[in-house]
Amino acid sequence: MLGFLKRFFGSSQERILKKFQKLVDKVNIYDEMLTPLSDDELRNKTAELKQRYQNGESLDSMLPEAYGVVKNVCRRLAGTPVEVSGYHQRWDMVPYDVQILGAIAMHKGFITEMQTGEGKTLTAVMPLYLNALTGKPVHLVTVNDYLAQRDCEWVGSVLRWLGLTTGVLVSGTLLEKRKKIYQCDVVYGTASEFGFDYLRDNSIATRLEEQVGRGYYFAIIDEVDSILIDEARTPLIISGPGEKHNPVYFELKEKVASLVYLQKELCSRIALEARRGLDSFLDVDILPKDKKVLEGISEFCRSLWLVSKGMPLNRVLRRVREHPDLRAMIDKWDVYYHAEQNKEESLERLSELYIIVDEHNNDFELTDKGMQQWVEYAGGSTEEFVMMDMGHEYALIENDETLSPADKINKKIAISEEDTLRKARAHGLRQLLRAQLLMERDVDYIVRDDQIVIIDEHTGRPQPGRRFSEGLHQAIEAKEHVTIRKESQTLATVTLQNFFRLYEKLAGMTGTAITESREFKEIYNLYVLQVPTFKPCLRIDHNDEFYMTEREKYHAIVNEIATIHGKGNPILVGTESVEVSEKLSRILRQNRIEHTVLNAKNHAQEAEIIAGAGKLGAVTVATNMAGRGTDIKLDNEAVIVGGLHVIGTTRHQSRRIDRQLRGRCARLGDPGAAKFFLSFEDRLMRLFASPKLNTLIRHFRPPEGEAMSDPMFNRLIETAQKRVEGRNYTIRKHTLEYDDVMNKQRQAIYAFRHDVLHAESVFDLAKEILCHVSLMVASLVMSDRQFKGWTLPNLEEWITSSFPIALNIEELRQLKDTDSIAEKIAAELIQEFQVRFDHMVEGLSKAGGEELDASAICRDVVRSVMVMHIDEQWRIHLVDMDLLRSEVGLRTVGQKDPLLEFKHESFLLFESLIRDIRITIARHLFRLELTVEPNPRVNNVIPTVATSFHNNVNYGPLELTVVTDSEDQD
């Protein structure tokens, strides 16, 4: 029935395209109508459209004319010189109808899926122009600085011709220049640059003139799937130097390496024993049917199952798994031990290992044997692995009548310090083990200039600004024997998911979005529209070729390269890691095939390498970094011989990455072909392939070196990829649920901070805070509750020491209610603050002379005090929230929902934060003292006095860091 309705009415995509096509026709009519106008008359259209918007006309009604203006300008610019990234080019672009259609969709808030070479960059100019007519901030977000600079210089020339201003944000741009850039009508930049400026404005800037942004109205995100999905779990973090260096990683690294070595030795010994028993069966296609022989083989496979849980990448294990029947036996034992009734037997077998490695979930666990061995290496006892129940420990101390109050306090401090030390050592041990067992050099990171540089798993590009979170980066530094750097302190953080939710309007463009349309809709409320290509795609997509082993696969890839290279076709070979690209490069050198390698180690030459990748006979081996924002243009000879040939060395866990690689060829009607080569040792196949695949392998195994190729295999691989994508989507959604809690708190604090910076009367804000503190004190007076560990008799002493007022609690309790007490306390606090403020102004006036605006300076100092303590308490709160987030998962043991627990406890922490901010500000308002040394150069005195109080806080050198969640490394 649904299929019939689609055939009759068309799919939703077809209906939208048909609706937008009517607007395209109107745009073309306006383009023709504008042709007779002079250049000046056409330029004046911008001012006219702006005025019409100010008069109340909507952008939707002006869209056909505005887009017609842009198209007409593009036509007039044809043949004119444009300098792009230092190269002189000539303008040769006029929007096609499909580009106008995509531009309409972007203005309407869609994500437009446009294939490689279809002109997304030019398409974005039209909605940028239309929305810039409002005078509100309009941003074009790219994936790197090079593309931001290129697009601003290239297509930004259209906007500048029309009288709009454009600016580009790149890393290293100074504050004053950033302010000017943000005043432009259209700003180009990367997601991290926009995000870090948002954080700086709301957590580092202490005066209005230090803030650079002017709001968030409309943004178009280029390669939107990369930014909103691949980078979704990657928070932007501004950090400063931590208080101290954590010695745990240095102290434990050798001991951890020894423990891992023991594990490898154990697994290697078990594997070799099994190999000796299976040697005679590895080269036969069919196993013998004798029952006793099969039982013996099965026992050897049981041993190899144990090896798979301790060293999943053991070479003997991988060799045995090449045989389909032996692979099936190992998998059968895996199913057996996963059954609930066999759990005890499974635990008994696993207890032979030191460490259980869960490759599927990218995790591990120390066994009792491993803990005992660790204790032998590191000293101490197994109790170190048990976290202390602090509530129980404190209760024992309180109930110990032999202890004096002072002894109880000292014992609590000692217990707290021991708990902190245990947690630090346990955390350090876990991260060092993760670095040794799960993080691979030249796959997850590279070592460069005594530093660990993360490799982006989706693009293959190095990310020198990133650090793995939660101490994992330091653990890898310890593993690789480079300098272990200090832990940093988080000053401000936001995820890209929540940053882009700040924009009133959001749109995107990419070549691969439809596979993630559900996520875009559910999380961002963005719909995906597939835009037709200008010319039919001539790419030939060959069926994948499957091989039993990596050895056979690489042999087939080299043969394919040699064959295609002999015909003269340019070839792009896509790999998933630096390690694989260098391995393949070595094989090609051995076969004397000239080629160029592009990976994270030589990414600086990317533009040069890509520029030559489309030439006749070129062979380029590249990681996924060649998949974003780069078009490989063919020379005429390459087109004649059949265009670019793309070879994939494996299937990625995301179908989008595979589509990106395919999309490198056959752009704009050019010829091309793509083929993927896989082995059953590939990570995707090992961890996520369907059991049906193993059955097929056993029945249809070809002779060694021959491939299996059938659409059925392609479908099974796609099913595995969908399974991984679904898993990753669940993780991203789960992460967002937690971050949403933090985001609401962030917005509340930033709004409070904004009010302080923008308040005309900071004195009124101070009075409001004093009133809140008075109400809190009044509540304590009436309730007999404890406050910060003090009972009621200590409260009077605390109040008088914190605030210079004389209060008698017993007299206050004679008043009728809390409000009456609060009013009395507030009146005294405000009166005393007014006296001190006036005294401070008077003293500053005498010291600075008549030319000094003492009142304004004192107000600025009060403002600085408020901002400083908001920032200080917020930083402490971020640490508390991180600890809560890391510990709340354990609540599942008590049958509690971790998310609900997190929401509840984070709310309590936030209430405490607000209280602490108010109390801290109130206390420090009464501690202000300004002294000015006589100085004839009054103009130099003013800024010094106004900022000196806040600058006593040493932030140290700030680090702009994109922190990758260590748990997300698949």
UniProtKB/Swiss-Prot annotation:
Membrane topology: Peripheral membrane protein
Subcellular location as annotated: Cell inner membrane; Cytoplasm
Primary enzyme class: translocase
A GO-annotated cellular component: plasma membrane
Leader peptide range in chain numbering: none
Keyword field: ATP-binding, Cell inner membrane, Cell membrane, Cytoplasm, Membrane, Nucleotide-binding, Protein transport, Translocase, Translocation, Transport
EC number: 7.4.2.8
Catalytic reaction list: ATP + H2O + cellular proteinSide 1 = ADP + phosphate + cellular proteinSide 2
Biological process according to GO: intracellular protein transmembrane transport; protein import; protein targeting; protein transport by the Sec complex
The UniProt record lists the keyword Cell cycle: no
Stretches that traverse the bilayer: none
Gene Ontology MF annotations: ATP binding; protein-exporting ATPase activity
Residues that bind ATP: 99, 117-121, 631
InterPro entries the record matches: Helicase_ATP-bd, Helicase_C-like, P-loop_NTPase, SecA, SecA_CS, SecA_DEAD, SecA_motor_DEAD, SecA_preprotein_X-link_dom
Highest taxon above the source species: Bacteria
Function: Part of the Sec protein translocase complex. Interacts with the SecYEG preprotein conducting channel. Has a central role in coupling the hydrolysis of ATP to the transfer of proteins into and across the cell membrane, serving as an ATP-driven molecular motor driving the stepwise translocation of polypeptide chains across the membrane.
Family: Belongs to the SecA family.
Subunit relationships: Monomer and homodimer. Part of the essential Sec protein translocation apparatus which comprises SecA, SecYEG and auxiliary proteins SecDF. Other proteins may also be involved.
PANTHER family: CHLOROPLAST PROTEIN-TRANSPORTING ATPASE, SECA INNER MEMBRANE COMPONENT OF SEC PROTEIN SECRETION SYSTEM
Name of the protein: Protein translocase subunit SecA
Origin species: Chlamydia pneumoniae
The organism's taxonomic lineage, starting at the top: Bacteria, Pseudomonadati, Chlamydiota, Chlamydiia, Chlamydiales
